[in-house]
Amino acid sequence: MNLFEDTNPRALKDLLTEIHNRVAVLPDFQRDFVWEPSATQELIVSIANNYPAGSILRVRDAKRVFAAREFEGAPPLDGTKHTFLVLDGQQRMTSLYQAFYGVGEHRYFLDLNKLIDGTDFEEAIFHVRASTKWAKAREDFDLQADELLLPLSVLKGGAGGFGQWSRKAARRLDNEKRIKLEDALDLIESKWIQAIDDYHSPVVTLSDKTE
């Protein structure tokens, strides 16, 4: 009997969507989320640089033997029938879900001015507590665009989400400045955003015959 259903890499954005839709959940015995935001930030830097960032182990849970719960920050399970239990990789996936979906105790931003100036990605990303006045003020698009601060949650829509945000930001400027900003943001998209959008994580899926 083959315990492995498959070992194929999965697109990160698809894995995060599964968490949001409660297709992938946690066994209730898993420990709570404990990662520091600095660790989340380092993980996002690795992904933007297409570095290995660990694998995911999950099991198809057709029998639903174990009590399950949603990932921290995801919508409540509320009777939703899940497909997978994530056995290893919880901390990484929770941190990425919260960062890209804009939930949890911290918010993550990219300073696009720094990226335009050629600064490395790790120097351009930062986090703040979601409860601060500063973070709440930057829920406003006009302020984001004025300061060229991109909430990482925009990227849950992948490169398309970034494209929509950047076009909307550039349209606020006159022709010459608009074209210059569009060109600069296109370079950021091709160098960094597309890498995040294309990122795949190794996933080992155990079959529902696993005991």
Where would I find each of the regions flagged by the language model?
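Basic- and aromatic-enriched surface patches that contact anionic nucleotides/nucleic acids
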Residues: 2-37, 41-211
